[in-house]
Amino acid sequence: MTTGPFVPHPTLDPKSLGKVGVILGGRSAEREISLLSGNGVLAALRSRGVDAHPFDPGTQPVAGLAAQGFHRVVISLHGRFGEDGTIQGLLEQFGIPYTGSGVLASALAMDKEATKRLWQTHSLPTPDFVMLHAGADWQAVADRLGLPLIVKPAREGSSIGLTKVTSVAELPAAYEKAARLDRDVMAEQFIDGDELTCAVIGEGEHATALPLIRIVAPQANYDYQHKYFTDDTRYECPAPIPAEAAARVQALVVQAYRSLGCRGWGRADIMLRKHDGAPFLLEMNTSPGMTGHSLVPMAARAVGISYEDFVLQLAATASLELRASHDWKPE
């Protein structure tokens, strides 16, 4: 495992990338953020001389991707139909190399229950959880997880549909709020402490963790609005924690990333428990935000990588996970 700084290829010729598509927008609840991310990526690629073009599957038939003549695409979609393996599967069918994780890793990481169960099998620390349903025994849920606790859709991002519940009486409404977005709803143990995030670049033994960022939100409320549209959230990069503790968290995040089979890039959210500093993995994002408020560009800047250079290198990592087998012949 490596945890040193990620260094872009110094001799990368932008023209060698060919015609690059930036897939943005889409049909998820995170469309607004995806448009911000994608337009930032598009501008960065063009500023480096790349022949880059937008493609929005929210307004164009997604099957039209095959006719665009893209040599590769940068996926700037967030949430469903973009971060869950669906667009990745389509691109595999079309034979168009793409950035980020493949079909299975994307699907696993998008599903919080699947992610947490897999991490548990690898003995990786993640908060306890219960899957909810309309007739749940709310008192039993609170007894198991304690209060406060978190209720959220199993397959949404950007804190959409999330509620911090402080009493049993609040659980039914929190469940209904999340259930309007997803049929699968999770109640998760609340970990009191510092919220961190850690970006990872690469694949397998070459996976590299970027510096940790500590997120300090007003009233510890790092919701959708505070993530993207306000300036009162404070980001500390590198996170002000001892170097040995930071290295342990980075190593844990790389383990979590590998366990899901992620490649290209990703970003994990972590809580550091207040009373003992123990880290807990919350989730893995396989198509992180690239807006002006986003955290991966911030971590990259901390090791001397500009937004434009990061995006250029990201585009260069586009690949296919599957190989065509139509030419296979038995030996």
From Swiss-Prot:
Binding, ATP: 142-197
Residues where Mg(2+) 1 binds: 269, 283
Presence of keyword Nucleotide-binding: yes
A cellular component term, taken from the record's GO annotations: cytosol
Residues bound to Mg(2+) 2: 283, 285
Domain (ATP-grasp): residue spans on this chain: 116-316
Signal peptide positions on this chain: none
Listed Gene3D superfamilies: 3.40.50.20, ATP-grasp fold, A domain, ATP-grasp fold, B domain
Catalytic activities: 2 D-alanine + ATP = D-alanyl-D-alanine + ADP + phosphate + H(+)
Cofactor comment: Binds 2 magnesium or manganese ions per subunit.
Similarity comment: family membership: Belongs to the D-alanine--D-alanine ligase family.
Biological role stated in the UniProt entry: Cell wall formation.
Protein name per UniProt: D-alanine--D-alanine ligase
Protein source organism: Ralstonia nicotianae (strain ATCC BAA-1114 / GMI1000) (Ralstonia solanacearum)
Gene: ddl
